[in-house]
Amino acid sequence: MLNVIATGLSLKARGKRRRQRWVDDGRVLALGESRRSSAISVADVVASLTRDVADFPVPGVEFKDLTPLFADRRGLAAVTEALADRASGADLVAGVDARGFLVAAAVATRLEVGVLAVRKGGKLPRPVLSEEYYRAYGAATLEILAEGIEVAGRRVVIIDDVLATGGTIGATRRLLERGGANVAGAAVVVELAGLSGRAALAPLPVHSLSRL
């Protein structure tokens, strides 16, 4: 039994050392570099691995595609570590459908807390709590389960990939508060500063890793 515990602690320590090899106080080391060499910020990593797609999903919208970022093991790990730092103190993480699921689950694992999936309308079995909202390219609905998951009284941080107008995170906040949760803040990978989403969510604390 002692050997099993010792092995578990050793693996955990090795995992921590692996993270520290490339993440150090918000800085990310390039592949193959030592900690003594120059590093780049998490924001720079996000920017370098974000793809701009014009006229998607509708004409006139420039879509920020974070798929290359999430597919890069160092990029994903750096983003996870940085978001987990900003979500510290939460006892539940809420991830927004769909790309928010990727980072929310990773952050929840890092913090050793649970993750709540905030789904698009019609994806969850009833009963549900629903909230309609408006985004840059039309109306939409978000839902969470009304039964089976206790959110009342829990300190929740909302995690998503992109903050644009604030409609999605605002609807998520209203859903969680209707369920009795204490929404402590929101953390996103990319904030589109020109769309005033942060102002729309005030006074909710909002943390972003990159402002584009």
Swiss-Prot record:
SUPFAM superfamilies xref list: PRTase-like
Domain of life: Bacteria
PROSITE patterns: PUR_PYR_PR_TRANSFER
Subcellular location: Cytoplasm
Entry similarity comment: Belongs to the purine/pyrimidine phosphoribosyltransferase family.
PANTHER family: ADENINE PHOSPHORIBOSYLTRANSFERASE (PTHR32315:SF3)
Protein name as catalogued: Adenine phosphoribosyltransferase
Organism listed in the record: Mycobacterium tuberculosis (strain ATCC 25618 / H37Rv)
